[in-house]
Amino acid sequence: KRGGLQWKYFQYVALLFTEMYLDRYFSDADTFCTDLNTWLRQAKDQSLGLIDFQPYTTDKLNKLAFMCATGSGKTLIMHMNILQFLHYFKRAKRINSRLSINKVIVLAPNEGMSKQHLDELALSSIPAAMFEKDRGFGKQQDDVIVIDMNKLKEEGKIKTVSVDSFEQNNLVLVDEGHRGLSGDVWYDYRTRLSEEGFAF
């Protein structure tokens, strides 16, 4: 539905980086981690210790973040990330049938942004549904679930749902551009929802 779309150079680079990252991550995460740490050691040596980051660990490679300016098309990139992840995940699942993802969840900072994500997903022909506590997790099992972060709580109430009810092996995409939750609550929710899955 988005015929004639022309990627800007920085969008193209972000998508290309994601392709390379997911390819290495799903092909052999341990070797990928080793290669990253080799690069870190070289960077530290070449910078005489000025570049000195903590080493990567394989269990922490399931997170990938992009910082994008307002109006740079981060929503569109996020939706492309869904398609990219599912492509590499399905390819890896043919080799390792134990791989699983429970849900694809887009966490939006408020109800207005949730509706915007839903509209944009429809334009990208990605099946999606707004999370409604009464109706559960969408019409189809593989629908993308869009949820307002403010509806996630430790314990579900009338208008909220417990963050633990989503399980931990989800693909979670967080729109942090307009963060709606104070402190590190959004970080905790993202971490728990994607602990055994993946997060953008």
Functional labels for PLM-detected ranges:
Residues 85-94:
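Post-Walker A helix-loop "phosphate-sensing" segment adjacent to the P-loop in P-loop NTPases
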